[in-house]
Amino acid sequence: MANSGLQLLGYFLALGGWVGIIASTALPQWKQSSYAGDAIITAVGLYEGLWMSCASQSTGQVQCKLYDSLLALDGHIQSARALMVVAVLLGFVAMVLSVVGMKCTRVGDSNPTAKGRVAISGGALFLLAGLCTLTAVSWYATLVTQEFFNPSTPVNARYEFGPALFVGWASAGLAILGGSFLCCTCPEPERANSIPQPYRSGPSTAAREPVVKLSTSVKGPLGV
């Protein structure tokens, strides 16, 4: 029962992390224009993501444009794209395996050991999905930080962390935590000869052969 509860907790945590990974991948606010220094002179907020760039007017109107060329993109954007897409695919496969392998489902009840291994495989894939997301988000954030503190970067061209990065960090943490819980629910190994054998006692003293006593008395010549 304890393992079943831990599996459910891990599954819902990892599932929430996977949904967050999808949201982080789709959001265009991976970095946003900084309002430090003289950059506040403009009333337009700029956002850039993995798939598009957006401009937000002070009136609330937002205009987005998809990137025209794949090859013209920077290497870190292409790498982040690949890692996030791989994380989404791994999370989908992990979700299916976890549902099949959890004890609360009826699939594969005839083989509990194999069922537990399937659940562990799902947890491992959730871990990989979280690590891919963590790598992509942290790498992107590092480059944004380097550009921000680069003296050659104009003040009005500097960017800060966007909401998508924080969503990605939180989602990666949930996926890693949930996957760890699923991996901790290891199936108990089957014990050979688990059926107790009946106890056999040795032969009782009552079944032993009777001991014949020989008379050692000596009679005289007259039989007295």
Curated annotation (Swiss-Prot):
Keywords: Cell junction, Cell membrane, Disulfide bond, Membrane, Sensory transduction, Tight junction, Transmembrane, Transmembrane helix, Vision. GO terms for cellular component: apical junction complex; basolateral plasma membrane; bicellular tight junction; cell junction; cytoplasm; mesaxon; nucleus; paranodal junction. Pfam families: PMP22_Claudin (PF00822). It catalyses: Mg(2+)(in) = Mg(2+)(out); Ca(2+)(in) = Ca(2+)(out); Na(+)(in) = Na(+)(out); K(+)(in) = K(+)(out). Disulfide bonds join C54-C64. Its main location: other. Signal peptide: none annotated. Residues 1-7, 103-117, 182-224 are cytoplasmic. GO terms for molecular function: cell-cell adhesion mediator activity; identical protein binding; paracellular tight junction channel activity; structural molecule activity. The chain crosses the membrane at residues 8-28, 82-102, 118-138, 161-181. Residues 29-81, 139-160 are extracellular. The keyword Transmembrane applies. The keyword Cell membrane applies. One of its GO terms (biological process) is paracellular transport. It is a multi-pass membrane protein. It is found in: Cell junction, Tight junction; Cell membrane. It comes from the Eukaryota. Forms paracellular channels: coassembles with CLDN16 into tight junction strands with cation-selective channels through the strands, conveying epithelial permeability in a process known as paracellular tight junction permeability. Involved in the maintenance of ion gradients along the nephron. In the thick ascending limb (TAL) of Henle's loop, facilitates sodium paracellular permeability from the interstitial compartment to the lumen, contributing to the lumen-positive transepithelial potential that drives paracellular magnesium and calcium reabsorption. Can form homo- and heteropolymeric tight junction strands. Interacts with other claudins including CLDN3, CLDN10, CLDN16 and CLDN18 with highest affinity for CLDN16. Interacts (via PDZ-binding motif TRV) with TJP1 (via PDZ domain). This is Claudin-19. It comes from Rattus norvegicus (Rat).
